[in-house]
Amino acid sequence: MVTHTKPIYRRIVLKMSGEALQGAEGFGIDTTILNRMVTEVKELVKIGIQIGIVMGGGNLFRGAELVKSGMNRIVGDHIGMLATIMNGLAMRSALNHAYVHSHLMSAIPLNGVCDHYNWMKAINLLSNNWVVIFAAGTGNPLFTTDSAACLRGIEIKADVVLKATKVDGVFSTDPIQHPDATLYEQLSYQDVLERELKVMDLTAFTLAREHNLPIRIFNINKLGALKRIIMGYKEGTLITK
Protein backbone atom coordinates (compact mmCIF):
# COMPACT_ATOMS: atom_id res chain seq x y z
CA MET A 1 0.00 0.00 0.00
CA VAL A 2 1.43 3.36 -1.03
CA THR A 3 1.20 5.99 1.68
CA HIS A 4 2.67 9.42 2.19
CA THR A 5 3.91 11.28 5.25
CA LYS A 6 2.40 14.44 3.81
CA PRO A 7 -1.03 15.02 2.24
CA ILE A 8 -1.21 14.35 -1.49
CA TYR A 9 -3.95 16.98 -1.95
CA ARG A 10 -3.92 20.58 -0.79
CA ARG A 11 -7.32 21.83 -1.95
CA ILE A 12 -10.34 19.57 -2.33
CA VAL A 13 -14.03 19.71 -3.17
CA LEU A 14 -16.09 17.34 -1.04
CA LYS A 15 -19.44 16.48 -2.62
CA MET A 16 -21.90 15.58 0.14
CA SER A 17 -25.10 14.03 -1.12
CA GLY A 18 -28.28 14.58 0.82
CA GLU A 19 -28.73 10.81 1.03
CA ALA A 20 -25.39 10.50 2.83
CA LEU A 21 -26.51 13.09 5.40
CA GLN A 22 -29.76 11.32 6.19
CA GLY A 23 -28.01 8.14 7.32
CA ALA A 24 -30.34 5.24 8.01
CA GLU A 25 -33.32 7.56 8.25
CA GLY A 26 -35.58 8.06 5.27
CA PHE A 27 -35.66 11.83 5.58
CA GLY A 28 -33.84 14.76 7.13
CA ILE A 29 -30.38 15.13 8.64
CA ASP A 30 -28.76 12.53 10.88
CA THR A 31 -26.89 14.72 13.35
CA THR A 32 -24.56 11.84 14.24
CA ILE A 33 -23.32 11.71 10.65
CA LEU A 34 -23.21 15.50 10.39
CA ASN A 35 -21.11 15.83 13.55
CA ARG A 36 -18.79 13.01 12.51
CA MET A 37 -18.18 14.72 9.17
CA VAL A 38 -17.44 17.97 10.96
CA THR A 39 -14.90 16.16 13.16
CA GLU A 40 -13.17 14.70 10.09
CA VAL A 41 -13.19 18.03 8.26
CA LYS A 42 -11.79 19.81 11.33
CA GLU A 43 -8.93 17.31 11.48
CA LEU A 44 -8.02 18.07 7.87
CA VAL A 45 -8.24 21.83 8.37
CA LYS A 46 -5.73 21.50 11.22
CA ILE A 47 -3.14 20.05 8.83
CA GLY A 48 -3.71 22.79 6.27
CA ILE A 49 -6.12 21.15 3.81
CA GLN A 50 -8.35 23.66 2.03
CA ILE A 51 -11.89 22.32 1.80
CA GLY A 52 -14.88 23.30 -0.29
CA ILE A 53 -18.08 21.36 0.36
CA VAL A 54 -20.85 21.06 -2.24
CA MET A 55 -24.18 20.15 -0.66
CA GLY A 56 -26.83 17.94 -2.17
CA GLY A 57 -30.47 18.10 -1.11
CA GLY A 58 -32.03 14.69 -1.70
CA ASN A 59 -32.57 14.07 2.00
CA LEU A 60 -35.06 16.95 2.10
CA PHE A 61 -36.59 17.01 -1.36
CA ARG A 62 -36.71 14.60 -4.29
CA GLY A 63 -37.96 16.60 -7.24
CA ALA A 64 -37.89 13.70 -9.70
CA GLU A 65 -40.79 11.97 -7.98
CA LEU A 66 -42.97 15.08 -8.00
CA VAL A 67 -42.11 15.78 -11.64
CA LYS A 68 -43.54 12.34 -12.44
CA SER A 69 -46.72 13.49 -10.69
CA GLY A 70 -46.99 16.59 -12.84
CA MET A 71 -44.83 19.23 -11.15
CA ASN A 72 -42.95 21.50 -13.53
CA ARG A 73 -39.29 20.38 -13.74
CA ILE A 74 -37.94 23.91 -13.35
CA VAL A 75 -40.01 24.47 -10.21
CA GLY A 76 -38.85 21.13 -8.84
CA ASP A 77 -35.21 22.04 -9.42
CA HIS A 78 -35.67 25.40 -7.72
CA ILE A 79 -37.12 23.67 -4.66
CA GLY A 80 -34.16 21.29 -4.75
CA MET A 81 -31.76 24.24 -4.72
CA LEU A 82 -33.45 25.54 -1.57
CA ALA A 83 -33.02 22.09 0.01
CA THR A 84 -29.25 22.27 -0.56
CA ILE A 85 -29.18 25.66 1.16
CA MET A 86 -30.96 24.16 4.17
CA ASN A 87 -28.29 21.44 4.34
CA GLY A 88 -25.61 24.09 3.92
CA LEU A 89 -26.98 26.06 6.86
CA ALA A 90 -26.89 22.92 9.00
CA MET A 91 -23.31 22.19 7.95
CA ARG A 92 -22.20 25.76 8.62
CA SER A 93 -23.81 25.74 12.04
CA ALA A 94 -22.17 22.43 12.95
CA LEU A 95 -18.74 23.61 11.76
CA ASN A 96 -19.04 26.89 13.66
CA HIS A 97 -20.09 24.99 16.78
CA ALA A 98 -16.85 22.99 16.44
CA TYR A 99 -14.85 26.24 16.13
CA VAL A 100 -14.11 25.72 12.45
CA HIS A 101 -14.25 28.91 10.39
CA SER A 102 -16.79 28.32 7.63
CA HIS A 103 -18.62 30.38 5.05
CA LEU A 104 -21.80 29.49 3.15
CA MET A 105 -22.19 30.64 -0.44
CA SER A 106 -25.32 30.17 -2.54
CA ALA A 107 -25.51 30.18 -6.33
CA ILE A 108 -28.81 32.05 -6.00
CA PRO A 109 -29.10 35.31 -3.99
CA LEU A 110 -30.51 34.87 -0.50
CA ASN A 111 -29.79 38.09 1.34
CA GLY A 112 -29.66 37.87 5.10
CA VAL A 113 -29.13 34.10 5.04
CA CYS A 114 -25.89 33.52 3.16
CA ASP A 115 -23.57 35.16 0.65
CA HIS A 116 -24.02 35.00 -3.11
CA TYR A 117 -21.36 32.81 -4.72
CA ASN A 118 -18.18 34.55 -5.85
CA TRP A 119 -15.28 32.39 -7.01
CA MET A 120 -12.56 34.92 -6.15
CA LYS A 121 -13.88 35.36 -2.62
CA ALA A 122 -14.15 31.59 -2.27
CA ILE A 123 -10.49 31.13 -3.23
CA ASN A 124 -9.45 33.86 -0.79
CA LEU A 125 -11.37 32.23 2.05
CA LEU A 126 -9.94 28.80 1.25
CA SER A 127 -6.43 30.25 1.19
CA ASN A 128 -7.04 31.58 4.69
CA ASN A 129 -8.07 28.16 6.02
CA TRP A 130 -11.83 28.72 5.96
CA VAL A 131 -14.13 25.89 4.91
CA VAL A 132 -16.37 27.13 2.10
CA ILE A 133 -19.79 25.53 1.68
CA PHE A 134 -21.36 25.77 -1.77
CA ALA A 135 -25.16 25.52 -2.02
CA ALA A 136 -27.91 25.86 -4.64
CA GLY A 137 -26.04 23.79 -7.20
CA THR A 138 -24.97 25.76 -10.26
CA GLY A 139 -27.84 28.21 -9.74
CA ASN A 140 -29.56 26.88 -12.86
CA PRO A 141 -32.26 24.24 -13.23
CA LEU A 142 -31.57 21.02 -15.16
CA PHE A 143 -28.06 20.71 -13.68
CA THR A 144 -27.25 18.32 -10.84
CA THR A 145 -25.22 19.01 -7.73
CA ASP A 146 -22.59 16.64 -9.20
CA SER A 147 -22.24 19.15 -12.03
CA ALA A 148 -21.95 21.89 -9.42
CA ALA A 149 -19.19 19.96 -7.64
CA CYS A 150 -17.14 19.64 -10.82
CA LEU A 151 -17.79 23.26 -11.80
CA ARG A 152 -16.76 24.59 -8.39
CA GLY A 153 -13.74 22.29 -8.42
CA ILE A 154 -12.57 23.80 -11.70
CA GLU A 155 -13.30 27.36 -10.60
CA ILE A 156 -11.42 27.15 -7.30
CA LYS A 157 -8.59 25.09 -8.84
CA ALA A 158 -9.18 22.07 -6.62
CA ASP A 159 -6.83 19.09 -6.82
CA VAL A 160 -9.68 16.57 -6.74
CA VAL A 161 -13.43 16.13 -6.29
CA LEU A 162 -14.24 13.63 -3.54
CA LYS A 163 -17.75 12.27 -3.92
CA ALA A 164 -19.06 10.94 -0.62
CA THR A 165 -21.53 8.09 -1.13
CA LYS A 166 -22.96 5.14 0.79
CA VAL A 167 -20.99 2.53 -1.20
CA ASP A 168 -17.26 1.74 -1.25
CA GLY A 169 -16.60 3.09 -4.74
CA VAL A 170 -17.42 2.26 -8.35
CA PHE A 171 -18.45 -1.34 -9.01
CA SER A 172 -18.81 -3.35 -12.21
CA THR A 173 -22.53 -3.62 -11.42
CA ASP A 174 -24.89 -2.80 -8.57
CA PRO A 175 -23.23 -4.35 -5.48
CA ILE A 176 -26.52 -4.49 -3.59
CA GLN A 177 -28.18 -6.64 -6.24
CA HIS A 178 -24.96 -8.46 -7.16
CA PRO A 179 -22.75 -9.21 -4.10
CA ASP A 180 -20.03 -10.59 -6.39
CA ALA A 181 -19.64 -7.24 -8.21
CA THR A 182 -16.05 -6.05 -8.73
CA LEU A 183 -14.85 -2.89 -6.98
CA TYR A 184 -12.55 -0.84 -9.19
CA GLU A 185 -9.57 0.85 -7.51
CA GLN A 186 -8.78 3.09 -10.47
CA LEU A 187 -10.38 3.91 -13.81
CA SER A 188 -9.77 6.29 -16.67
CA TYR A 189 -12.45 8.66 -17.88
CA GLN A 190 -12.63 6.56 -21.04
CA ASP A 191 -13.12 3.34 -19.04
CA VAL A 192 -16.14 4.85 -17.31
CA LEU A 193 -17.71 5.94 -20.60
CA GLU A 194 -17.04 2.67 -22.42
CA ARG A 195 -18.36 0.50 -19.59
CA GLU A 196 -21.28 2.87 -18.93
CA LEU A 197 -20.48 2.92 -15.22
CA LYS A 198 -22.65 5.05 -12.97
CA VAL A 199 -20.26 7.59 -11.46
CA MET A 200 -21.92 10.95 -12.08
CA ASP A 201 -24.34 12.30 -14.64
CA LEU A 202 -22.79 12.74 -18.07
CA THR A 203 -22.67 16.55 -17.91
CA ALA A 204 -20.70 16.52 -14.65
CA PHE A 205 -18.40 13.75 -15.79
CA THR A 206 -17.69 15.36 -19.16
CA LEU A 207 -16.84 18.64 -17.43
CA ALA A 208 -14.32 16.88 -15.18
CA ARG A 209 -12.78 14.99 -18.09
CA GLU A 210 -12.35 18.12 -20.23
CA HIS A 211 -10.48 19.86 -17.41
CA ASN A 212 -8.54 16.81 -16.17
CA LEU A 213 -10.16 17.08 -12.75
CA PRO A 214 -9.69 13.79 -10.84
CA ILE A 215 -12.73 12.28 -9.12
CA ARG A 216 -12.67 9.85 -6.23
CA ILE A 217 -15.78 7.99 -5.11
CA PHE A 218 -15.70 6.74 -1.51
CA ASN A 219 -17.88 5.53 1.34
CA ILE A 220 -18.64 8.33 3.77
CA ASN A 221 -19.76 5.79 6.38
CA LYS A 222 -16.23 4.39 6.76
CA LEU A 223 -14.68 6.16 9.72
CA GLY A 224 -11.50 8.00 8.75
CA ALA A 225 -11.88 7.35 5.01
CA LEU A 226 -11.61 11.03 4.15
CA LYS A 227 -8.25 11.47 5.87
CA ARG A 228 -6.93 8.21 4.42
CA ILE A 229 -7.63 9.54 0.94
CA ILE A 230 -5.88 12.82 1.70
CA MET A 231 -2.84 10.95 3.03
CA GLY A 232 -2.54 8.78 -0.07
CA TYR A 233 -4.10 5.52 1.05
CA LYS A 234 -6.08 3.49 -1.45
CA GLU A 235 -9.72 4.17 -0.65
CA GLY A 236 -12.70 3.95 -2.96
CA THR A 237 -12.27 4.46 -6.71
CA LEU A 238 -10.03 7.05 -8.36
CA ILE A 239 -10.96 8.29 -11.84
CA THR A 240 -8.34 10.16 -13.85
CA LYS A 241 -7.28 10.62 -17.47
From Swiss-Prot:
Cross-referenced CDD domains: AAK_UMPK-PyrH-Ec (cd04254)
Pfam families cross-referenced by the UniProt entry: AA_kinase (PF00696)
Alphabetical list of InterPro entries matching this protein: AceGlu_kinase-like_sf, Asp/Glu/Uridylate_kinase, Uridylate_kinase, Uridylate_kinase_bac
Chain positions recorded as ATP binding sites: 15-18, 58, 62, 165, 171, 174
Positions annotated to bind UMP: 57, 77, 138-145
Gene Ontology annotations for the cellular component aspect, listed alphabetically: cytosol
Gene Ontology annotations of biological process type: 'de novo' CTP biosynthetic process; UDP biosynthetic process
Pathway the protein acts in: Pyrimidine metabolism; CTP biosynthesis via de novo pathway; UDP from UMP (UMPK route): step 1/1
Compartment(s) of residence: Cytoplasm
EC numbers for this chain: 2.7.4.22
Similarity-based family: Belongs to the UMP kinase family.
Record protein name field: Uridylate kinase
Organism from which the protein derives: Blochmanniella pennsylvanica (strain BPEN)
Lineage of the species this protein comes from: Bacteria, Pseudomonadati, Pseudomonadota, Gammaproteobacteria, Enterobacterales
